[in-house]
């Protein structure tokens, strides 16, 4: 049996797997830049998600996302994540997507753009459900941005402020380095699989509550503060019970999560009704955390203000992970292309720590094997 090195850390924590030109989370400075451009500049200047997709994938604003094709969602399971994951995987046989190994970069880019807008369309169709009539395509075609088309396909007549809120959220969520779902997308892409398989696999990774479900878990805390009227007592109660304070702390940033800063400003600018209670909770939480853990810098993370912005845009809690998926398609596509160009299979190793050599007779249950043979 191999001896485990003393400095071994499971889960690839701290291991550098790739170099990338796509995004730079500045952990010490509290900034996030897409190909060198700060997300605060993108959101404050109302750059739409479709254009940010192009920035991440192409490195310029030349050619954003095209409109989604009027293609019906092929499955309605009642779960938005399942619907979009299955729908994307089915694009490969429907549209004849070849393996990444067998196509050039331009074709891969075109397929990724086509699949990305279909992911947005599938989320909107799934959320609207089968008990409401579909929004006529001619109305969707009148929309000027990909985000407006998404909101119209889902809600019919969305509030323009809600469209702006979703744009701000998607731009903030579009890319964040080597997280679990992005790594999954790159691993699948490294095998030469088709783009739909890589995107579908990334959605599967994001379905885990440790990655994509945190914004929805902030809302009950805001609800409780609105009922109690005392943010500090609610926060103290959560911490006294040993529960996790949702929306605070991040594995990457030592300073404030820049995405939280961007979305806080968006919530204030758009007049989100829960902005004031969210500010009260944030201030109470930060004060309490600093008193209890003066040796640790625990700041607000993106999930806290994402919950406020998404709630303002009338996104139900069970749909929030799917909205994260929509935004992150941009980063996934950029990394899939980057991995294709790298052309190297991702194949880490593992240290075996199981039993040493032994006979089958020495394994518990061998007698039952004999009786059924």
From Swiss-Prot:
It catalyses: oxaloacetate + acetyl-CoA + H2O = citrate + CoA + H(+). Pfam families: Citrate_synt. Keywords: Acetylation, Allosteric enzyme, Transferase, Tricarboxylic acid cycle. GO terms for cellular component: cytosol. One of its GO terms (molecular function) is citrate (Si)-synthase activity. It comes from the Bacteria. GO terms for biological process: carbohydrate metabolic process; tricarboxylic acid cycle. Gene3D superfamilies: Citrate Synthase, domain 1 (1.10.580.10), Cytochrome P450-Terp, domain 2 (1.10.230.10). Pathway: Carbohydrate metabolism; tricarboxylic acid cycle; isocitrate from oxaloacetate: step 1/2. InterPro entries: Citrate_synth-like_lrg_a-sub, Citrate_synth-like_sm_a-sub, Citrate_synthase, Citrate_synthase_AS, Citrate_synthase_sf. PROSITE patterns: CITRATE_SYNTHASE. The modification N-acetylthreonine is found at residue 2. The active site is at residues 250, 303. Its EC number is 2.3.3.16. SUPFAM superfamilies: Citrate synthase. Belongs to the citrate synthase family. Citrate synthase is found in nearly all cells capable of oxidative metabolism. This is Putative citrate synthase 2. It comes from Mycobacterium tuberculosis (strain ATCC 25618 / H37Rv). The gene is citA.
